[in-house]
Regions:
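Membrane-embedded helix-loop-helix hairpins and adjacent transmembrane boundary segments
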Residues: 2-391
Length: 391
């Protein structure tokens, strides 16, 4: 971001905002601990410690190379699990009868508003109106701007591979959406007596023999690992590269050699991984009812700040430095105010991080366009270099 707009402020500010990824990591740790709790019978807090230890050791020893090389294998396991969830859902496994209609009937008996013909649930903070549902979609538009996702593009050896990447990623991403059906299936079978985030592991343990359920649990852990390792690496890079190498080293370590700076950066990244693990543990110790709430309290702030400078700036050549800074500030500050209002003030019943994020993303996008049109554009040569069109 700093290079796109020749702005040290944007590079440093976005680096600090990206530390909100610790909430994302906390959500992944909660998910892993839940798997250990349901499948292995571990105490939830012990599961948290085990999850952090395994992930941190894995990343510290392997780094980005291990992250990228193993994500492909873990991704295959995730796709297989998602397909299995889809199959047992459409077969209506666990019910007397065949087909997804069995699941729908069970849901309607529990609560008529859960039926598939109901799109809105009056009074619900997430699905109470068409506008609230729309904000969920808006909040996800810039999701690829998350640092741990965007960095994957740098693993491509040739920009021409982006086409192949998209041809694979789009259908695979669609298949992974089948996992949502596991939540419906579990609710239909077990009612609301289980914690929502336990739905899929409980579904596996009840429908399959222990050995098979264990293997399926490994698939779910693969999904958690493939996300968590990237998150840890992203935050480590923020500390070691964005803050130290690009910002502070040129000022405080002018006399040090390139090799010395690289070694210091490596040590900083390893320390950062440990610190992030400790903070994530603390956040995960007493999680909210839904993981999505914990996750979006962090992700929403990052996306609100990235929408203008990164998303619009990567598509629109006319984006300006002033517009990017204004958009970043509007997005981040409005998100912070919204989160404090909705989640810190106890008397406020409206606790919807998607609505807060979606609204702030819209505000940031509008700010980016208006301010950019009113301010001086960046030099043409610089823009050509950024878009790969220089002579």
């Amino acid at each position: 971001m700093g290079q796109r707009y020749n702005s040290n402020f944007l590079r440093i500010a976005f680096a600090f905002v990206s530390m909100l990824l610790v909430y994302y990591i906390a959500a992944q740790i909660v998910a892993a601990a839940t798997i250990f709790e349901v499948l292995l019978g571990l105490n939830y807090q012990h599961g948290i410690l085990a999850s952090v230890a395994v992930i941190a050791l894995y990343i510290t020893m392997g780094g980005s190379h291990a992250d990228i090389m193993t994500d492909g294998i873990q991704g295959i396991m995730m796709v297989l699990i998602a397909l299995l969830i889809g199959v047992i859902f459409f077969m209506g496994v666990g019910f007397e009868g065949t087909g997804p209609s069995m699941i729908n009937n069970a849901l309607v008996i529990q609560d008529p508003s859960l039926g598939w013909d109901n799109y809105l649930k009056e009074g619900d903070i997430l699905f109470g109106s068409f506008w609230l549902i729309s904000l969920i979609f808006v909040a996800h538009i810039p999701f690829a701007m998350n640092p741990h996702i965007g960095k994957l593009a740098f693993a491509l050896k040739d920009p021409k591979q982006i086409r192949t990447f998209l041809l694979i990623a789009i259908p695979v991403g669609s298949i992974l959406g089948f996992t949502v059906l596991g939540g419906l299936h579990a609710r239909a079978l077990f009612g609301d007596v289980i914690r929502p985030d336990q739905a899929i592991p409980v579904l596996f343990t009840q429908l399959f023999p222990p050995f098979i359920a264990g293997l399926l649990g490994v698939g779910v852990l693969s999904a958690i690992m493939s996300t968590s390792d990237g998150l840890f690496i992203s935050i480590a890079v923020i500390f070691s590269n964005d803050l130290y190498k690009k910002t502070f080293a040129p000022v405080i370590h002018k006399s040090k050699s390139k090799e010395q700076i690289e070694q210091i950066a490596l040590n900083i990244s390893r320390v950062a991984i440990v610190l992030v693990g400790v903070v994530a543990c603390w956040l995960a110790w007493n999680p909210p009812q839904f993981l999505a709430v914990l996750l979006w309290m962090g992700v929403g702030g990052i996306l609100a700040g990235a929408t203008g400078p990164l998303l619009i700036g990567s598509l629109w050549r006319r984006a300006t430095k002033t517009g990017a800074i204004a958009s970043f500030l509007v997005g981040v500050i409005s998100f912070a105010v919204g989160i404090v209002y909705c989640f810190v003030l106890k008397e406020v019943p409206f606790k919807n991080p998607f609505a807060v994020a979606g609204s702030c993303i819209i505000a940031a996008a509008i700010t980016m366009v208006i301010v950019s049109l009113m301010t001086k554009p960046l030099p043409k040569q610089h823009v050509d270099d950024m878009f790969g069109e220089s002579a």
